[in-house]
């Protein structure tokens, strides 16, 4: 379409956001191949996935394998973890960010062939977590639901993408427009078309250099209005953009 876009994290010099990194980078958030498990009331342990390493999931909850949790303040029992996404019909959504099935993969500018291969690895990582739940935590009666997705592997059609290209829109909506909307030079709150009410919540736990990134777990923000100009590209007519591709800063995208 010819729409210009940004990828990754802008520096605080670019966006004037005090919690942004000092330098811009192309790092995006982890994605997740969510799994829906069903209780079959019998042992339904899957075949061990290729390259399975239980230590990758060791501190997803409190268990004997977890000796040095990276997030000691966010540790729960296996039962609390598994019921986090409890659904009707004895099903469980597995979308667990703490050493679970989050997976770092920047496929935004990959070819179709490269994406297909990379996404198979992401699927395999989720299967590894399912196998860990079954063999290390004792949930061997839970396995991929056979009546949720019409796919051969019983996984969703696509992963949960937390980040994509963000267009250069008529306006760029930053954290400052949320935290102090009436103090900005551009009164974007006057053009709001939708209301948001969720904290800044970034997933970077599977990125190998996560220690160098800002900690953006549930950074509090007030309710906010989303301006119309974030949906409209700056230089292309007759196009409206939605979801993760609107014109916001990386911080706000989270």
Each model region followed by its residue ranges:
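Flavin (FAD/FMN)-binding glycine-rich loop and adjacent Rossmann-like elements that form
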Residues: 2-253
């Amino acid at each position: 379409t010819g729409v210009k876009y940004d990828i990754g994290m802008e520096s605080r010099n670019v966006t004037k956001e005090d919690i942004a990194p000092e330098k811009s980078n192309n790092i995006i958030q982890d994605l997740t191949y969510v799994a829906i498990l069903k209780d079959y009331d019998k042992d339904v342990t899957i075949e061990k996935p290729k390259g399975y390493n239980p230590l990758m999931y060791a501190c997803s909850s409190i268990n004997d394998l977890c000796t040095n949790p990276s997030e000691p303040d966010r540790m729960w029992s296996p039962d609390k973890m598994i019921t986090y996404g409890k659904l009707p019909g004895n099903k469980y959504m597995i979308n667990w960010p703490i050493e679970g099935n989050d997976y770092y993969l920047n496929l935004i500018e990959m070819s179709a062939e490269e994406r297909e291969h990379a996404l198979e690895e992401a699927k395999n990582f989720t299967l590894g977590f399912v196998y860990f739940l079954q063999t290390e935590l004792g949930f061997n009666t839970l396995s991929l639901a056979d009546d949720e997705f019409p796919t051969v592997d019983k996984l969703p059609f696509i992963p949960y993408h937390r980040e994509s290209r963000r267009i250069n829109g008529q306006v760029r909506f930053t954290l400052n427009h949320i935290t102090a909307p009436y103090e900005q030079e551009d009164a974007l709150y006057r053009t709001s078309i939708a209301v948001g009410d969720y904290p800044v919540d970034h997933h970077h736990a599977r990125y190998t250099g996560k220690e160098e990134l800002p900690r953006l777990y549930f950074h509090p923000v007030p309710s906010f209005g989303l301006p119309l100009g974030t949906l409209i590209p700056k230089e292309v007519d007759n196009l409206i953009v939605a979801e993760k591709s609107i014109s916001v800063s990386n911080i706000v995208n989270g």
